[in-house]
Amino acid sequence: MTNWKLEISYIGKDFYGFQKQPGKRTIQGELEKVLSFLFDEEIRVIGAGRTDTGVHALGQVVNFKSRGHKGFSCDKLHKVLNRLLPEDIKIKKVEIVDDSFHARYSAKRRWYIYVVYNNDERDLFLKDYSWWISREINRELLIFSANLFKGVHDFKNFCVTEDEDQTVIEVYESFWYFKKDLLIYFISAPFFLRKMVRFIVGSMVEIALGRKSLIELEDYLKEERKERFSVPAPPWGLYLFRVDY
């Protein structure tokens, strides 16, 4: 068996997330359809991150196994995939890796970024790729709140928990980068819970708009609550940025 590793990017707005679903357009479904055709066998793709509906990726990593090369070098497969896949999925890199490599379980760290556009007027070309907030955001409060999420915390209050049994996570990095009207949040951890980054961003924005306090956020990080601190930020500002192995 040959174990292939792909680094891919995609625009998530017209997909129902990464994971394959019957009758719905997904990243996994599109990849498996093309790869199964090329290798003339049923191909199953494994992704490092199962992004939700509308979420984008700059550096998603997947792997799949095939019975042989079928005459494909890494370079040739790279080019053929980019010709056959839809325009909103791009293959960035193709490698043959050790049989033990698993895109999800071999990952050491995942990075996400979230883009906020803070201006009193909407930008037509950013509307599908960022969260537009017209009210002025207190950037200092964004910085302070991001620091609170760094370290080991139970994120039960900041995720969708129906099927999550491990909610204690160490967040390695949590910080904002500002470039004019673009506010870009970076976060890294070994893994993330469903909608976790969106709940974190939504919480920080609530504080930065003066609706909640840093003290309230600290309390939510210490003990489980029945009510959420905030609603999740919309999916179209979120990107799976990078996966480290």
UniProtKB/Swiss-Prot annotation:
UniProt GO MF annotations: pseudouridine synthase activity; RNA binding; tRNA pseudouridine(38-40) synthase activity
Reactions accelerated catalytically: uridine(38/39/40) in tRNA = pseudouridine(38/39/40) in tRNA
Sites where the protein binds substrate: Y112
Superkingdom of source: Bacteria
Class in the EC hierarchy, top level: isomerase
Active site: D52 (nucleophile)
Key words of the record: Isomerase, tRNA processing
GO annotation, biological process: tRNA pseudouridine synthesis
Pfam families: PseudoU_synth_1
E.C. numbers: 5.4.99.12
InterPro entries: PsdUridine_synth_cat_dom_sf, PsdUridine_synth_TruA, PsdUridine_synth_TruA_a/b_dom, PsdUridine_synth_TruA_C, TruA/RsuA/RluB/E/F_N
Family: Belongs to the tRNA pseudouridine synthase TruA family.
Binding partners and assembly: Homodimer.
UniProt function note: Formation of pseudouridine at positions 38, 39 and 40 in the anticodon stem and loop of transfer RNAs.
PANTHER family from the UniProt entry: PSEUDOURIDYLATE SYNTHASE, TRNA PSEUDOURIDINE SYNTHASE-LIKE 1
Protein name: tRNA pseudouridine synthase A
Organism, as annotated: Dictyoglomus turgidum (strain DSM 6724 / Z-1310)
Gene: truA
